[in-house]
C-alpha cells in the first residue's frame, strides 16, 4: 500500500484557491485528492489512474467532493481535459 508523503507540503505548494482545477495524475489511493477535498470545498479534481480497482474503491470516499474519475494513463491527460471541457488547470499532482 502506498503511503502519501509530504502531504501538507504538496497541498500548500499548489497554492490553491476556491474554484481551482487540479489534476491528480497518479491517483492511486487518493491521499492528496482527499486532503484537497477536505481543505477546499469548491476545488474541482480530475483523477487519473490505470488501476480501475483503485478508482472504484475511492468513489465512496469522494462522494462529497467535486471529482471526476478517469481510468487512463496520465499520457492521455490532454484527451481527458478536452473531454471535461477544461482548457487550463491550476495544479497537477504526480505521486
Q: Where do the protein language model's features map onto the residues?
A:
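Conserved SAM-binding loop
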Residues: 58-59
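Conserved class I S-adenosyl-L-methionine
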Residues: 18-28, 46
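Short helix-loop-beta connector
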Residues: 15-21, 87-88
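A short acidic, Gly/Pro-enriched loop at the edge of an enzyme's catalytic core
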Residues: 79-94
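Conserved SAM-binding strand-loop segment of SAM-dependent methyltransferases
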Residues: 62-77
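Conserved SAM-binding loop of SAM-dependent methyltransferases across substrates and taxa
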Residues: 29-42
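Conserved alpha-helix/loop element of class I SAM-dependent methyltransferases that forms part
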Residues: 3-18, 35
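Conserved SAM/SAH-binding beta-strand->alpha-helix loop
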Residues: 51
Amino acid at each position: 500500500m502506498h503511503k502519501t508523503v509530504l502531504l501538507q507540503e504538496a497541498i500548500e505548494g499548489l497554492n490553491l484557491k476556491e474554484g481551482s482545477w487540479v489534476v491528480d495524475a497518479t491517483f492511486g489511493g487518493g491521499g492528496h485528492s482527499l486532503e484537497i477535498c477536505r481543505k477546499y470545498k469548491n476545488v474541482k479534481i480530475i483523477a487519473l489512474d490505470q488501476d480501475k480497482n483503485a478508482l472504484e474503491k475511492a468513489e465512496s470516499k469522494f462522494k462529497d467532493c467535486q471529482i471526476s474519475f478517469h481510468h487512463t494513463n496520465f499520457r492521455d491527460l490532454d484527451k481527458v481535459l478536452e473531454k471535461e471541457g477544461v482548457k487550463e488547470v491550476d495544479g497537477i499532482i504526480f505521486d
